[in-house]
Amino acid sequence: MQSHEPHPGMTVRVKAGHWKSKFDGMRGTVEHRWGHPHHLALDVLLEDGRLQLFWFHELEKA
């Protein structure tokens, strides 16, 4: 996935090795995009109902 790809409504997965390991492999839906495409942050509504902010590089297309 490239930084221009994620958009609201897209399903993503947290990459393994995330610094908060409880999120490893969780799926969610992109709610909002923030910042410059080279330093993109994404609000993701996770499958457990939590809204969490991730850096682009911490996610992959599900």
Residue ranges and their predicted role:
Residues 7-62:
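Basic/aromatic-rich interaction segments and small domains that mediate binding to polyanionic partners
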